[in-house]
From Swiss-Prot:
Pfam families: MMR_HSR1, MMR_HSR1_Xtn, TGS. The keyword Protein biosynthesis does not apply. InterPro entries: Beta-grasp_dom_sf, DRG, G_OBG, GTP-bd, GTP-binding_2, GTP1-OBG_CS, P-loop_NTPase, Small_GTP-bd. GTP binds at residues 71-78, 117-121, 250-253. It comes from Dictyostelium discoideum (Social amoeba). It comes from the Eukaryota. The gene is drg1. Residues 65-292 form the OBG-type G domain. One of its GO terms (molecular function) is GTP binding. This is Developmentally-regulated GTP-binding protein 1 homolog. Keywords: GTP-binding, Nucleotide-binding. Belongs to the TRAFAC class OBG-HflX-like GTPase superfamily. OBG GTPase family. GO terms for cellular component: cytoplasm. Disulfide bonds: none annotated. Residues 292-369 form the TGS domain.
């Protein structure tokens, strides 16, 4: 029996099984089997010549972040790439115009953001149809995904693309599950949860059965939140990508205001017309917000800060002085003594800080060496 047939068999059995407390154990085992078969299906061709990425797909990462345009053929991805970056991608009114991966660069707020126009996705991509597998594989390397939808048929396309990406282990606008999973040499499967958690979807028997399906017989599993069977399987698989996503509703000039108001309820969405250049500024602002980039200006001793060439790094807890130094050159941190920081992250201007200080957008930093 082929993998595709095995997957179909498991999916059929899941469809026949009623979802209730009595069947949750059985469904958990079926979901684990399904995840295993799908992984094998996706990884299978990588051992042979069929796994070749194809012309234009081996695009080296450039700039401060990478953004991928994913959508069905002829939804306006190539036009959007041209309008945002000035990079020319062949545009026509028929499907499958783009056959390779076209890179461009957005220069925005001092940052260089690589934008990839990927070939149009088709249903069944996760199962290897068309070039969808290659498209989604590149999507896994992106810091942000823009799903471009045609305003005339947005919800149908949205559902299909989400299913294809999910089948390839890409989780959109989600955080990694709060589960600690650690294999060990002996002691069996130990399942526990933190005191503030009352698990309703995972119990010890289900966890043990799923682990047995993966031939894992010794492990510690700690729930730090109320997680689902699917989330536990994601943790065991260990190859899931959690990436922010913006739904770009293109060709809004072809629908009425009333229809646009209805579509406004879609979360994480921006309406545009790439052809008429409507609302592209709002899209750029949203891209900047979702990438969580910050600009840090360098200040040589005795000189004014360099406002023309900011150092662009990811914001949040990762945006430490050490990250800032390593972004410039990894030798700086070895000679680091302290930093003087001006800006919203400083308690007073300037503040003397160590390498663990977390920076904010548009901070000014002067490095003092040993």
């Amino acid at each position: 029996m082929s993998l595709v047939q095995k997957i179909k068999e498991v999916e059929d059995e899941m469809a026949r099984t009623q979802k209730n407390k009595a069947t949750s154990f059985h469904l958990g085992v079926l979901k684990a089997k399904l995840a295993k078969y799908k992984r094998e299906l996706l990884l299978g061709p990588s051992k042979g010549a069929a796994a070749g990425a194809g012309e234009g797909f081996d695009v080296s990462k450039a700039g401060d972040a990478r953004v991928g345009l994913i959508g069905f053929p002829s939804v306006g991805k190539s036009t959007l790439l041209t309008k945002l970056t000035g990079t020319s991608s062949e545009v026509a009114s028929y499907e499958f115009t783009t056959l390779t991966c076209i890179p461009g660069v957005i220069n925005y707020k001092g940052a260089k953001i690589q934008l990839l126009d990927l070939p149009g996705i088709i249903e069944g991509a996760k199962d290897g149809k068309g070039r969808g597998r290659q498209v989604i594989a590149v999507g896994r390397t992106c810091n942000l995904i823009l799903i471009v939808l045609d305003a005339m048929k947005p919800l149908v396309h949205k559902k299909i693309i989400e299913r294809e990406l999910d089948g390839f282990g890409i989780r959109l606008n989600k955080q990694p599950p709060p589960i600690t999973f650690k294999k060990k040499e002996k002691g069996g499967i130990n399942f526990s949860h933190t005191p503030n958690v009352n698990p309703t979807q995972l119990d010890s028997e289900t966890v043990k059965a799923i682990c047995a399906e993966y031939k894992i017989h010794n492990a510690d599993v700690i729930l730090r939140g109320n997680c689902t069977v699917d989330e536990f399987i994601d943790v065991i698989e260990g190859n899931r990508i959690y990436v922010p996503c913006i739904y770009v509703l293109n060709k809004i000039d072809a629908i009425s205001i009333e229809e646009l108001d209805l579509l406004d309820k879609i979360p994480h969405y921006v309406p545009i017309s790439s052809h008429l250049e409507w609302n592209l500024d709002a899209l750029l602002d949203k891209i900047w917000e979702y990438l969580k980039l910050i600009r840090v200006y360098t200040k040589p001793k005795g000189l004014i800060p360099d406002y023309n060439e900011p150092v662009v790094i990811r914001g949040g807890e990762e945006a430490s002085i050490e990250t800032f130094c390593n972004h410039i050159h990894n030798s700086i941190i070895r000679q680091f003594r302290y930093a003087l920081v001006w800006g919203s992250s400083a308690k007073h201007n300037p503040q003397r800080c160590g390498k663990d200080h977390v920076l904010a957008d548009e901070d000014i930093v002067q490095i003092v060496k040993k």
